[in-house]
Every structure is written in C-alpha cells, then in structure tokens.
Amino acid sequence: MKTLFFATSNINKINEVKQILDIPKIKIEIPQNFDIKETGKTFKENSLLKAKALFKILNNKQPVFSEDSGLCIEALNMEPGIYSKRYDQYKLGKKLDNNEKNHLIIDLMREQNNRTAYFICVISYIDVDGTINNFEGMLKGTIALNIDYYQKNGFGYNPIFLTTNNKRLSELNLEEKNKISHRGIAFDKFKKFLMQFLD
C-alpha cells in the first residue's frame, strides 16, 4: 500500500479526487489544517508551492501531491485565473459567497460577445526522493448568461460554465463531471503515471 498526502483542505476537491484516484494499492491522506498562501503567478507555481510546503512539513520523506485550478475567461484577460478562489477580494476587496461570486462574473460579462472560457488544472507530485512531476488538464466551454440556482452538483463556478455540449457543469453528477473536467483529465494522467509503479 502506497500512501500519498494531498496538499489541500478543500472538501469538494477531496471528494472529486478520491473518486478518480480509486486505486486499490493507493491510500490518500489529508493533512489537518493545511493552509498555504498562494503567491505564485501561474497555476503551476501555486501547485508546486503547496506540494513543496507539505513535503517539507512531512520532513521530505513522504510522497505528496497538490493541485491548483481555476477559471480563465478570454474576454476578461483570462481572469479570474489564479485568483479564482479569491476573485471577490482581488476585484472588490471584500468576501462574497459562491452565488455572489458567480453574479460578479455574470455582471462583468454582461456586454461581452466572446464568452469562451477554460477551466485549467495543474497537479504537482513530489516523490519520496524529491522528484517532481506535473500533470495538466483543461476543459473548454463558455460562460452562461445566467446562474443555475437549481442544480445541486458541483461547486465554485460550475453553475455558470457551459460545456461544449451546452450542459452546465452543475448539471453533471460527479462521475459524469470527472470524465470531462479539467481536474478529471489531469488526475487521469496522474493516475496512469502512478499505475506504472504499482504493477
């Protein structure tokens, strides 16, 4: 049994990742009270920052992985981007709930014809010997004209993101979402990488 430590405290990410990395010989541990300031300028920098921080906390002796992801909108100069989680504070200087954050995006996009957007995910894995590998995933879609208040699936910007088949991410259950999402694609690459060493 190989134990991997996941550098996150986001319960939604944990649930998605545990379903994708459902490998019999892999056990995923979540560190308690893990909270690192994301000061990188790219998803990759932030992902590496978190992985390296946890690797150090575990005395450079345990395999760790982290991920950073976000929504990039062409008409908004690829924002929210790395500020996706804290776009409210970056843009308005105050904290908003999820619905309010989605409203902010809808308002900013009100006059925009180009609604093309991307969800991007970067995973950083550090093995026990300190070797680093990165895995990326991207989902292309568009920003909806309004918010889906009724679907209970997904989190964050899922209620305003339309996939190429015109379905909101919030309409998909976890299994459906993981097949096409940025996180699903990146973690599928990571899973295949891990499987090489478990045979």
From Swiss-Prot:
GO terms for molecular function: dITP diphosphatase activity; ITP diphosphatase activity; metal ion binding; nucleotide binding; ribonucleoside triphosphate phosphatase activity; XTP diphosphatase activity. Substrate binds at residues 8-13, 69, 155-158, 177, 182-183. Its cofactor is Mg(2+). GO terms for biological process: nucleotide metabolic process; purine nucleoside triphosphate catabolic process. InterPro entries: dITP/XTP_pyrophosphatase, ITPase-like_fam, RdgB/HAM1. It catalyses: XTP + H2O = XMP + diphosphate + H(+); dITP + H2O = dIMP + diphosphate + H(+); ITP + H2O = IMP + diphosphate + H(+). Keywords: Hydrolase, Magnesium, Metal-binding, Nucleotide metabolism, Nucleotide-binding. Mg(2+) binds at residue 68. SUPFAM superfamilies: ITPase-like. It is an enzyme of class 3 (hydrolase). It comes from the Bacteria. The keyword Metal-binding applies. Its EC number is 3.6.1.66. The active site is at 68 (proton acceptor). NCBIfam families: PRK14825.1, RdgB/HAM1 family non-canonical purine NTP pyrophosphatase. Homodimer. Pyrophosphatase that catalyzes the hydrolysis of nucleoside triphosphates to their monophosphate derivatives, with a high preference for the non-canonical purine nucleotides XTP (xanthosine triphosphate), dITP (deoxyinosine triphosphate) and ITP. Seems to function as a house-cleaning enzyme that removes non-canonical purine nucleotides from the nucleotide pool, thus preventing their incorporation into DNA/RNA and avoiding chromosomal lesions. Belongs to the HAM1 NTPase family. This is dITP/XTP pyrophosphatase.
